Amino acid sequence: MTTPARLAIVIAIAASFAAAQSLDFATYRAKVEPIFLKKREGHARCVVCHAGAGNAFRLQPLDPGATNWTEEESRKNFEAVSRLVNSANLLSSPILKHPLAGTAGGDDFHSGGRQFQSKNDPDWKTIADWARGSQSK
């Protein structure tokens, strides 16, 4: 591998790490995390498949009877979801690309179906805004 190629890889890794450091937990908890609990017509809630999952998008299981996560559980979810944000190329972020319809730029890696039919879906936009660094107001 050439030196410029190695440098490009190091820069991309550093940018992703910096983005993960700059993502806002309060915004995540108030605006993004509720999306994972939301029932979408024709789909299971994200938490149903991703609680305790063995993949990168692993959400904490909800306690019996709970309708939300505790702050500690939310922080663990935040850490897992933050790793799915690619700040160097936001639209290639797995958290945005996997559940998006192929016709809107998504991919085939989400076995839970196309949760978002377009980038205009309000929930997709909420996740994208958070990934860009928007903060809760």
Where are the model-predicted features located?
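Hydrophobic h-region of N-terminal signal peptides that target proteins for export
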Residues: 11-20
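Aromatic- and Gly/Pro-enriched helix-to-coil junctions and flexible linker segments
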Residues: 20-137
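A ubiquitous, low-specificity "background" feature that marks scattered single residues
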Residues: 9-12, 129
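Bacterial N-terminal signal peptides that target proteins for export
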Residues: 1-9
